[in-house]
Amino acid sequence: MLIVLYLPLEKTMKLLIQNLIIASLSTSAMSEYVGLSFEYEEAGDDLWTMRLYADFTESTDQLTGVFADSQSSLYIRSENGFYQNPFGGPTSLSINPALFDVFPSLEYDSWVTIGSEDQIDNAMLVAGIDWSEFENGGDIEIDNGAWFATTDDIQTIAGNDLRVLIGQFTTYGWDSQIYGSINLVGQYGDLEPFAARDQYFGWVPGPSTIIVLGLAGIHTRRRRS
């Protein structure tokens, strides 16, 4: 079941993001968020699927949210459009793994998440986002909203892989680039919050490789004492 929170005048959403970001702006230092990474695979019928991750240096680091606000918008785009399965949804909250045997192509649905690849034990929330264009195969474009979980939710933790899943995106054709710019908030294992704005990614796949086109942005955190 998809859970969407509609917040009055968007004030609650702004406070949620601002509180996390302001707490991380006192000084900057070497961050334990190290950037974005990906996995990809062929999905059949001239489709290819990319999984996007936020990478960390400590297993206890956490990614708690992906957001957009007045300072930094968010977009995730594909040149040939995104594959959307009718039995899926815009987030991993809609992915029921019990249906994979009956509808194998559901495994390649396009969705966003915080750490969880399906609805099992998934505590993610969504605020202020209209998914209609994305669900029709179009882009994700957000100027004020977020998908997120709390620091109490295990799905936010980097774990032994030192990464947290952000989304799965399937597109049409090997010539179709998936690219975007996202903003992240989270918390390090020492309980210090961080914010990473304008994290750009863009990859063009090939039969045996993907070309990394770019990765840029800024992130801030409190200095360790």
Positions of the model-derived regions?
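Low-complexity intrinsically disordered segments
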Residues: 9-10, 24, 206
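Sec/Tat signal peptide C-region and signal peptidase I cleavage site
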Residues: 12, 27-32
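Short, Lys/Arg-enriched N-terminal segments with co-localized hydrophobic residues
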Residues: 1-12
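A short, hydrophobic C-terminal helix/tail in secreted or cell-surface proteins
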Residues: 205-221
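Positively charged n-region of N-terminal signal peptides that target proteins for export
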Residues: 10-16, 221-225
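Non-catalytic macromolecular-recognition regions in eukaryotic signaling proteins
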Residues: 32-203
